[in-house]
Amino acid sequence: MTTDTPKARAAPRPKKMAVADGPAPPDPARSTGPRLRDKEQTARRQLLLTAARRLLRKGGAQAVTMRAVADEVGVSTTVVYGFFQDKATLITQAVDGDLKRFAHHLERAVQEACSPADSLLRVAVAYVTFGTAHPQSYRLMFMEPRPASAIENSSIEFGNASEDAYALARALVEGLLATQAAPIDDRTIEMAAQMFWEMVHGITSLRISSDDDPWFHRLPVVEHVERMVRIFIAGLLHDIGSSASTSVK
């Protein structure tokens, strides 16, 4: 008589774990790597710009070379060229931060203005007081000769009044001229804006370079600016009105 040998029972298969729908969680090692590298690149770029500004203050644009900036930071010139295509671009972007702060300062000054003329008056006072309070920064922006660089090489958006201080001044001059009955063309707006810009730059640069000149007594700076701008506005509007009357005749 034969007896069947009982078959061995198969081990139960492990149950599959349910997988939730949606993307897999990020791998910390992978996700933080690029971000860390970006931060390092940003920090290194800022070190190069700071070094360029330091050299500008010491010896002007002629003191700024790719080699000199590399030596200041302790890197090779290849690293500098990796961020900036040439010396002109490097110097331009080294000064961009000052120009943006300056533009923001002017923009804040006109927020409480009650008229186009008041806006122009406020921005003129803000321009001069900023320059005289920050002479080193002002020298870098407007008194230190720099190699020309294409607009697209700047980090400032051309024509954006929040970053481009001249664009703000031009818009304010245009707003003032728009109060006149006669139509105003772009050439007239541009000429008036440049006259205003050169006027406030003139008083600022003189205050910075020779404010202690003993040969004449200067008016308090705000009083000086306000009087000057009122005369400018009166003369400009009179000239526009006279030109309109002549053209009608």
What are these regions (language model features)?
Residues 41-52, 69, 94-98, 102, ...:
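Generic hydrophobic, amphipathic alpha-helix propensity
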